[in-house]
Curated annotation (Swiss-Prot):
Protein name: Leucine-rich PPR motif-containing protein, mitochondrial
Superkingdom: Eukaryota
GO CC terms: mitochondrion; nucleus
Molecular function terms from GO: DNA binding; RNA binding
Subcellular location: Mitochondrion; Nucleus
Family annotation (PROSITE patterns): PPR
This protein's UniProt keywords: DNA-binding, Mitochondrion, Nucleus, Repeat, RNA-binding, Transcription, Transcription regulation, Transit peptide, Transport
Amino acid sequence: MSALLAGARFLLRPGLRALPAPCVRLSPGQGRYLNNTPGHFAIAAQQKGHIHEEPVSAVRAKQAQQFDWALNKLDSSVRRTGRITKTLLQKIFHDVCRTGYPSSNQALLLLRSCGSLLPELQMSERTEMAHRIWEKLQELGAVFDVSHYNALLKVYLQNEHKFSPTEYLAKMEAANVQPNRVTYQRLIAAYCNEGDIEGASKILGFMKNKDLPITEAVFNTLVTGHARAGDMENAKNILSVMRSAGIEPGPETYVALLTAYAEKGDINNIKQTLENVEKNEGSLTDRDLMQVIWSLAKAGYPQYVQDIVERMRYDRGYIPDAMNLCLSLMTQGFEDVAFLVLKSFSAASHDSPNGDSLHHGNFFLRHCVNLDKPANKVKQFCDGLKEENLHSAPLQFALYCSLDAKKADLALELMKMMKQEGMPVRPHYCWPLLISFQKEKNAEGTIKVIKALSEIGVELDVETYSNYVLSVFNDVKSARAQLQEHGCTVDSSWFNLAELRHDAVSGNLEEVYSLLSSPSFPSVDLGHFRGSLITAFKRSNNVDLKAKITELLYKDGRYCQAASGPNEAVGYFLYNLIDSMSDAEVQAKEEHLRQYFHQLKNANIVISANIYRGIRNLLDSSHVPELIKDVIVLVDSQETLTSSDIAKSAELKASTLEEEIETLKAENKPFGDVLKQLVMIHCSEENMQKALEVKAKYEQENLAIGTYAALIQLCCRHDNPDEALNLKQELNRKDSSAVLDTSKYLALVKVFGKNGRIADAINVLKEMKEKDVPLKETTTTSFFHILNAAALRGDAETVDKIHESIVTLGLAKPTSNLCSPLVSVHLEKGDLPAAMETLFTCSKKYNCMPRLHDVLCRLVEKGDTDLLQKAMDHISQERGEMAMLYDLLFAFLHTGKYKEARKIIETPGLRARPGRLQWFAEKCIATNQMEALENLVDMTQKLFECDRDDMYYYLLKLCKENDDWKKADSAWTKIQEENVIPRERTLRLLADIFRRNGQEVPFDVPETWYKDAAESKVLASSSAPSSPESSFQKRVQVLSKKNRAKDAYEAFMEGENNGTAMSASAYSSLIRSMLSEGMLEEAKKVLNTAENHIKGFTLNDAASSLLIITQVRRDYLKDALASLKAMLEGDKVPTQLAVTRLVQALALKGDLEGIEVVENMMRNIGSSIRLSQMLFINNKMLAHLKRGKTEEAIELIEPLYTGTDSQVTSISYVFRKAMEEKMESALEKLSGMAERLANQFAVYRPVTDLFLQYIQVGRKDDARFLLQRCGSIAEQTPVLVSFISRSAQIPGQAQLIKDLLELIPEFSERETAYSYLMKCYATDKDATAATALYEKMKSESVSPDELFLKRLAVLLREAGEPVPFSEPPESFKFYADKLKKDKADSYDDEH
């Protein structure tokens, strides 16, 4: 012992004591037991084998794209929670293996993740995972250095893995990896954890020979070593030795001593040591005390844990650390101790009453389920969580976890317990279990679940029987028999309905009629089995039986329970029946249907005129007009049919409608519908005077609510508040319960506010509240624009009163954005004291500070120090001193007060706030404030925790916008001076600036897609002397990089004739260049040459994908399929573009089988390359259409929209291709399907997509007719706005937006559409059209936004025309960002 300590003193000579001493923490889970057998350590084999001649940056760039997000997620998880999941680690590991080029950092991160960061896994499993990762990475060519060996050592210690330290050193030496100080420290820890002081002495000897310092960490491990050797006296004496060596024992030392006492169960010495630490003004963190708890639990002294828990200070981060401790304890079987720690969360959450504490037990319960803890134990913990107020519904959450983990027995036991506690147990709770049994056709498991639920009084419903139970058995009868045989209580009503559905789907109409006509059959609405019955009707030719069933449905009240009565119910059934049949089926069964309709007439079955019209349209589209007269006889005689009900009505003009009104009036017939059409036509033409005249002329006829709504909005658009108010009051007198849509109410508020009629505006707002008008996402934004328009007019009274009403009535939350006009109105007047007082009022009343930055900038510019000090005091009080300092900093920077700004940034204790810094940097970029941004970057150099790469990235973004390569070059120099390691995005941005300005890039650029790093290396070394071979290769690479594929190929052929070979990277570069130019045959020749010269040469992912794209372009689809198959067999990943191009080409050939082959290939990797879920669906449809099988295409897509878990987005692609390929017959049937989905299922996306495609290809009349048949298209605002936005991105598309607005004159987002239309005119340089649009908006009283005005002003100025308004001063980007924030209603409260 004395020799050991003497060696330590010798090494701790002056000059070495001050060196940094990374500690070896004895964290929960750190290793204790070692042996002298190498075991699995054989994986750390000598680093030998083939190493590629040079890295291929194209593959590395793709690698970064494909799984760097996951690595970032892993790193984020560690930083946030201190742990990761096995699933995440395995996913990242799989991605690394698949890519095949692991970097050093990635390997290090994966290895480090296999220790205590996986508290939910057993230690042995964690070690096995580390071994697998090590072996696989080594196999893939990863080069391990000392950091990797040290990481593996740390994992061994944390996982208590037994290994021989001397063997470990030997393996490192064999691999030519020199151990460093950290290696020796961890090897000493390995010996000390075993109590092997002699072994530790050997390692200390190594350190002495290498003149390495003995740090505090070494002494800490010696404390553990002596304690585990049974020598507590020497363990305590280590502290004296440390002091004599000039090292004061730190927290880690005391933790080591406390852990030693804990392993002995010596609670008295633990308490005494803790008191000594406090007396000496030392401090142990909660995480330190958790290590003591871990040791007490493992040593078998749980009775002392509470004493340690009571000493917790609940530091920031306590809960995540305690969670990890709990998980580790539970994994090792100490769940009761873990629960004791968990109960401390109540005290830790005391100061955070945000509801999070009610879910702190989630992780605990989930881990209990994963560890297969018995139900009674889980229940015990649930009760404890409830008592401690750590979970609002612990038993329900435990059930959710057990269902998610497919733990059937535990789930059923928990349901039983829930029932005993009086909690509801619903039938759908068992669906996850039944689904798994359904897949396995496991009748026994299904019966077990049903029986268990039956025993606790839970009866299954029809959905459960139909979807998850009956399909497990051979037939319904056997299902009923087996369930009854096992004593399962079956709800006869639901089971009978399930049986009815089953018989109907089977086509057994006789049994269906028998069941429905049975007096014992339960009362059930037709809607529950309509679909199944339609299927049966289509399969059967028994007209008599179908008529009997229809009559039964009509006359038996059990089946028509809706308030609308049997006319509607049976009518919709008939409509759906015809709708479900293809044209060919309707034509083939024309006579059959005629007989059916006749029998319905004889049975006195009646349908409504509205439903008749729908059936008529279906029959007409199926080309069986003769059947229409057989249906019309079913119409209720009390309803009036016009001539337009028999033939399709043509588009009517105003004069025609007026004539029809006069005719109907003369015949004393109602003409309300025609009058509505006439008014609507005048509204669409913006003819307010004529619309009001028509309304006045026929005032005796009751106008529909929709007519009043259209007139009101027309008057609002024409800034006529008097007529708008009169119409609104008249509507209220006629029908006080009438409710307008949201846009009409907003139009009224806007026009009243604009004209100073505040009381009227407030009355409208009150009505919105009283009538519970639905508030859309855009409503708050509309309120903001109304208030902001008043603020810009300087109308403070209007702003204040309307804002107060909006907030008081609860129509919108008082966000910073909504409150900003309250301040803006004073800023517009230049009244800073009033703006400040309003700001303070908003802060106190609404907890937000709107336009704070603008107010502070005005105060700084004016030099009003008193008001500025008052503002700072308020901000500091409300949001803290840190927020106040940042607000003041940005105000100084914005106004050019850089000396004052620097004083702020040098405030002691100021830390970086990335969100705030990003906000101001992006503001500088938007407003082109280069000087302010440069100063910000310079000032934040020494700001604590400031991400310097981020700051320089912002600066370079502005340099790029200004094409200022000199400032970018200066920034690059400063980056190097500060020793900042720039990220890839920063380097790419910097390289782009240099290249755009014709400057040489002074560094290797991380390449993207198929560009090769070798190319840049060749260019960088162009000045070096080279051999003829290297000169030839360099020439090929340079030409390839410049996309001069033909010249590169000629150079290659010249070298080939001279017998000169190239490197693998040069061949790859040339092949990619030729493929990108479509030189397929030449690329194949180069590929063959490369394979002959270089053994094992293959194309990488990007080049292989490019090969597929080229083969598709040349129509070599079989070759493309073979190439894709070869890629996947070689563990390569195709690009999204390659797969998409191939599938689309197969569809145009009608090759459905080929598409299905590709779909199967992509099943496991489709999500990783972000393949659209609609790619295969759309192209299968298209393949069916190309084959002439329209019905199959419709059968493929329709269930996807009508299913319960529909995730279908858009079939716009299919519509477009059908139009391009002139498939009019198919298009007509697709149109019928889209309209059917809209009318029957309220699924409007398909019909809206078709409408927009008609506009896109210029088929305006078709779009108009479709809109007339399906008016709901006009209400699909998000889809329509998206179409307008996309159109505005492409030059020459203004007409599309104009056509859309012409077709939908009442479009709710008209202001947005006008803004995009102005963008089109600006792109097309069409100043005349832009001016006309501006005048049109003024005539409609539509206020243009600032981005609109900015675009118009620039356009007019460039055209040499005068600008008739004050041009907004900021940049386009500034106003675009502002609009985005307004739209999302997410304006940052601090700004």
